[in-house]
Amino acid sequence: MIERTETPAPASTPSKTWDVAIVGAGYVGVPLAHTFATSGRSVLLVDVVQKVVDGLNRGESHIEDVPSAELAPLVAAGHLAATSDYDALRDADAILIALPTPLSKQREPDLSIIVAATREIAKRLREGQLVVLESTTYPGTTREQLLPILESTGLKAGEDFNLAFSPERVDPGSAWDVKEVPKVVGGITEDCSRRAAELYGSAIGTVHTVSSPEAAELTKLLENIFRSVNIALVNELAQLCDRMGIDVWEVVDAAATKPFGFMSFKPGPGLGGHCIPVDPFYLTWKAREFGFTTEFIELAGKVNEAMPYHCRSLISQALNHKKQKSMSGSQILVLGVAYKPDIEDVRESPALKLIELLRNAGANVAYHDPHVPSIPELGLESVPLDPAQYDCVTIVTDHSSIDYAALVDQSDLVVDLRNATGDKGRDSDKVWKL
């Protein structure tokens, strides 16, 4: 929710020297800017979306994890500002790149956004500046993509300017503040690493330096592939448990009582967000350059990508058995479309794919999400939560603001893909669980 303040917008970006400029005012850039600014650094956010820039300069945050009440005083004091003018980068001591690294339609790395930004930086690069890439990517990106562009200016990394990679570790909607999460840093040279570590160390509690940008790049991929593989394991187990008539949630909870040798992961309708569904493909693509096939990682990706299809089948079974209805013509409410609880981000959300599959099967689909007012690409807006109007309510994202016990009482049929209904759902003949 954007909280509006009365802080006036400056007519233009103040002309000054900035400690840090961050290219990309999104889910990574804004929390990072907030962290540096609250630590006493002067910060400039650079973004091509003028509406975002204007809002930030009024002290209005479009990122839920950084409330406007915290942002506005920093703007008013001149510690933080925003601009769409890349020329302002000339006045920054350090330039951090926090831009998306999506996949192409062919599910291959798309670095076009960060490459374009690096070219803009190169036009303004001066001696003594530090450039750090934060965007998640494959090992070799900093050295193979950014370094040649920046050195085409005639300046040399490690001598005239510094270049490093430090992966973002933002977890939207979580209790983890940016300054509390250790920062991994790997520079082109030791001097590059040292300069980057000094910058991050001024605002973040712990900095861990590795030997190269490649090591830092692979660190981030390992973190997210670890989650992808383990989630795939429990997703596959959930499908087997469905056939065996065993409650997978009960099994996972029981296994989690072991105090060693087990980490609990929960099944669900698929992966979502800007990292976990995307990152494995970055590594598998790069691995092919070395004649290596990451079979285990790719299999996990296939299992997770198949989950919306399994969930569609589960909804169909529930309608057939509980209401003697087919999917075609049924009224279905999807509850929660953000990719994780209590945030507004729908990037790569499995809810979007599930809605598409349900529509293709002839269902009339609506959704309710207290954090996501609309999904323009699907032509949908969030509807009031009135479960009794629908043949089936499907819980896709378990936002904490929903009373799930009341939901069960008011619904004819609930398909619970997140175990949000807990014991009440287990004991109710109206609830089907993943």
Task: Please place each PLM-identified region on the residue numbering.
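Structural/interface elements that position substrates and couple domains in central-metabolism enzymes
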Residues: 2-434
